[in-house]
Swiss-Prot record:
The lineage of its organism: Bacteria, Pseudomonadati, Pseudomonadota, Alphaproteobacteria, Hyphomicrobiales. It comes from Rhizobium etli (strain ATCC 51251 / DSM 11541 / JCM 21823 / NBRC 15573 / CFN 42). This is Elongation factor G. Belongs to the TRAFAC class translation factor GTPase superfamily. Classic translation factor GTPase family. EF-G/EF-2 subfamily. Pfam families: EF-G_D2 (PF22042), EFG_C (PF00679), EFG_III (PF14492), EFG_IV (PF03764), GTP_EFTU (PF00009). The keyword Protein transport does not apply.
Length: 699
């Protein structure tokens, strides 16, 4: 079967935003207008197509990013293929956003016109910056009370440090919002309410907006000509670019991430969605417009690139594992190069295992269609893969490559969990392992001392939903303990330790001597190992044993047994024995060496500090600040946002449990907050003593 759509007609994009900015509703409208849905699903009815897990429909939030393929006819009459990924906006599910952005070519950032740039908008924006994803902005909810398009434009500059190129102006606001002014064509689009937004009239720009439209068109042209010398010169000589040239320059600037075209509308009231779809075609990149994916040659470790071309060897990235009630485990993958046929064998280069593609599916939210083959640029779901996990590379076994890996955040909260009936122990283990395979930010471990099962994740809601899914999907009822903070330990000063491991038990003995400098790692929280051995005091083949020995102890620090961060170790001297030395002997020596050194190196307890933003009516500001201070919070600042006040603070996670209930009663339900992990910080000594006393007995 040949390729149906040329690769230049593909648009792989995601929709990203703060929770409640209207992402799922916008996606529903896109599916409706592109003909994939016959009835519009509303989130508040629990009927949205993209939100297919039961918990999503109950809570009205999106948890997993559903991938959907649909089609749209551009302004030129040509059909385009859209692969859309709907991502969650709740901070506990940031991992979903991160891995979606990794495999997308472009994104639409949604803003709530009333709130503008919110904390989670900043978080997902930063993630998109990290992967250099071209973005457009859609200022949604223009029909909402307090909607202010121009303030949102300003906030993009002040809060995100980004340049928005305004492409449309709103006609009216709040309940009077009727349509938009198109600043390229210089006309107005007014939607007909009775047609569910499917039809609109193109009319002249209203008189009261003509001057503003001229002003903003001028700004638009000024910004876009800056990226092209010839266009800039022509403009300075008084020659204005024509409309096609403006679109071409906007496209170039968007793909190069120089600026972000901005549109407005209200997805819920069905206004402004079709011009947004035209803009996806006009301004977001096809797989051919973005740089080739980088990787390393599996055999030679040389840097290589794979281009978006069916003729190149197959390479794809598994970016999500999902448990499907009908098909079993599904692996979502983005094909970067080559083509994939059903039944073919691929190599997982991260695990060095071959996998056979049993079935290949194209997903529409939670319905599916079997396909025989897929091509460069496609996003597909594969059934039958046994070894593959999120972030793995799958490729042609004859031309193996390892694509750039994804990075996943460390969990900040953990709870003990046990099945309500002893007979469910095995079932619970199976369920948790399945869920951990789907979500790399969720971890499961067994506490060595107590034998308890511990689950760890990105927040209370994250773990609530895991427990909930276990009950619904795997029929396992569980008891959960109180949430516990994922503390860490570090060292604060340099120390040098000389340790000799000697054991003689008849026959071959064990001997290893190491001299190591331990100090805080100036480069960050990771462990860094260096060898400065000269003259063969420790043979080269034993040095990996020294590193492995230290790493094995980092999982349990000297104060209360928490994992250690930010340690640097430098091996400077040692000794070996021709017969009795081995890698294992050096592993044992370095392990004991670090245990001794850690006691002398000023071990310190660290706790996760959270960036908290509270949006509250002015009446409650004093109470909110007083309460945050009582939680050991450090107030970072406050600003007005409309009639509300936004308070920013850094607060230890340990003091934020059940904060939502406190805030609700303090503000009579009128204040809201968001919380994201910010950094690890030293625990004050009086609090550290309590924590050590509590945990030392458990470890």
């Amino acid at each position: 079967m040949a390729r149906e759509y040329k690769i230049e007609d593909y648009r792989n994009f995601g929709i990203m935003a703060h929770i409640d900015a209207g992402k799922t509703t916008t996606t529903e409208r896109i599916l409706y207008y592109t003909g994939k849905s016959h009835k519009i699903g509303e989130v508040h009815d629990g009927a949205a197509t993209m939100d297919w897990m039961e918990q999503e429909q109950e809570r009205g939030i999106t948890i997993t990013s559903a991938a959907t393929t649909t089609f749209w006819k551009g302004r030129d009459g040509k059909m385009r293929r859209f692969n859309i990924i709907d991502t969650p906006g709740h901070v506990d599910f940031t991992i979903e956003v991160e891995r979606s952005l990794r495999v997308l070519d472009g994104a639409i950032a949604l803003l709530d016109a009333n709130a503008g740039v919110e904390p989670q908008t900043e978080t997902v924006w930063r993630q998109a910056e990290k992967y250099n994803v071209p973005r457009m902005i859609f200022c949604n909810k223009m029909d909402k009370t307090g909607a202010d398009f121009y303030r949102s434009v300003e906030m993009i500059k002040t809060r995100l440090g980004a340049t928005a190129v305004v492409m449309q102006l709103p006609i009216g606001a709040e309940s009077d919002f009727k349509g938009v002014v198109d600043l390229v064509e210089m006309n107005a689009l007014i939607w007909r309410d009775e047609s569910l937004g499917a039809q609109w009239d193109v009319v002249e720009i209203p008189d009261d907006l003509k001057a503003k439209a001229e002003e903003y068109r001028e700004k638009l042209i000024e910004t876009v000509v800056e990226i092209d010398e010839a266009a800039m010169e022509a403009y300075l000589e008084g020659n204005m670019p024509d409309n096609d040239k403006i679109r071409e320059l906007v496209r170039r600037g968007t793909i190069d991430v120089k600026f972000h075209p901005m549109f407005c509308g209200t997805a819920f009231k069905n206004k402004g969605v079709q011009p947004l779809l035209d803009a996806v075609v006009d301004y977001l990149p096809s797989p051919l417009d973005i740089p080739a994916i980088k990787g390393i040659d599996f055999k030679t470790e040389a840097d290589i690139e794979r281009h978006a071309d069916d003729a190149e060897p197959l390479s794809m990235l598994a970016f999500k594992i999902m448990n499907d009630p009908f098909v079993g485990s599904l692996t979502f993958a983005r094909i970067y190069s080559g083509k994939l046929e059903k039944g073919s064998s691929v190599l997982n280069t991260v695990k060095d295992k071959r996998e056979r593609v049993g079935r290949m599916l194209q997903m529409h939210s939670n319905s599916r269609e079997d396909i025989e083959e897929a091509f460069a640029g496609d996003i597909v779901a594969l059934a039958g893969l046994k070894e593959t996990t999120t972030g793995d590379t799958l490729c042609d076994p004859l031309k193996p490559v390892i694509l750039e890996r994804m990075e996943f955040p460390e969990p900040v909260i953990q709870i003990a969990i046990e099945p309500k009936s002893k007979g469910d122990q095995e079932k619970m283990g199976l369920a948790l392992n399945r869920l951990a395979a789907e979500d790399p930010s969720f971890r499961v471990k067994t506490d060595q001392e107590s034998g308890q099962t511990i689950i760890a994740g990105m927040g209370e809601l994250h773990l609530d939903i895991i427990v909930d899914r276990m009950r619904r999907e795997f029929k396992v009822e569980a008891n959960v303990g109180a949430p516990q903070v994922a503390y860490r330990e570090t060292i604060t000063r340099q120390t040098e330790e000389d340790y000799t491991h000697k054991k003689q038990t008849g026959g071959t003995g064990q001997f290893a001597r190491v001299k190591i400098i331990f100090e805080p790692n100036p480069e960050g929280e990771d462990f860094k190992f260096e060898s400065k051995i000269v003259g063969g005091a420790v043979p080269k083949e034993y040095i990996p044993g020294v590193q492995k020995g230290i790493e094995s102890v980092l999982s349990s620090g000297p104060l209360a047994g928490f994992p250690m961060l930010g340690v640097k170790a430098t091996l400077i001297d040692g000794a070996f024995h021709d017969v009795d030395s081995s890698v294992l002997a050096f592993e044992i020596a370095s392990r004991a060496c670090f245990r001794e050194a850690a006691k002398k190196a000023g071990a310190q307890l660290l706790e996760p500090m959270m960036k908290v933003e509270v949006v509250t009516p002015e009446d409650y500001v004093g109470d909110v600040i007083g309460d945050l201070n009582s939680r050991r919070g450090q107030i970072q600042g406050q600003e007005s946002r409309g009639i509300a006040v936004v308070i920013s603070a850094n607060v230890p996670l340990a003091n934020m449990f059940k904060y939502v209930d406190n805030l609700r009663s303090m503000s009579q339900g009128r204040a809201q907050y968001t919380m994201t992990f910010d950094h690890y910080a030293p625990v004050p000594s009086n609090v550290a003593t309590e924590i050590q006393a509590k945990y030392s007995g458990q470890k």
